């Protein structure tokens, strides 16, 4: 690597809106504010919503199920 051409790679803190602070390294060299992190994201916390699309799937199978049927 060439000397003095790469940006500074320093330790920074990323602060989430939930208050969680993550220490990481970046070339940005200033604190980052996050909207969501692994502590508050619904996928990681297990509080995700399941959308009920069963009616749409059944309707699709009724209309187009004939085309996918094997002979």
UniProtKB/Swiss-Prot annotation:
InterPro entries linked to this entry: Ribosomal_bL28/bL31-like_sf, Ribosomal_bL31, Ribosomal_bL31_A, Ribosomal_bL31_sf
GO biological process, one term: translation
One Pfam family hit: Ribosomal_L31
Keyword RNA-binding listed: yes
Family stated for the protein in its record: Belongs to the bacterial ribosomal protein bL31 family. Type A subfamily.
Record note on quaternary structure: Part of the 50S ribosomal subunit.
The protein's name in its UniProt record: Large ribosomal subunit protein bL31
Lineage: Bacteria, Pseudomonadati, Pseudomonadota, Gammaproteobacteria, Pseudomonadales
Gene that produces this protein: rpmE
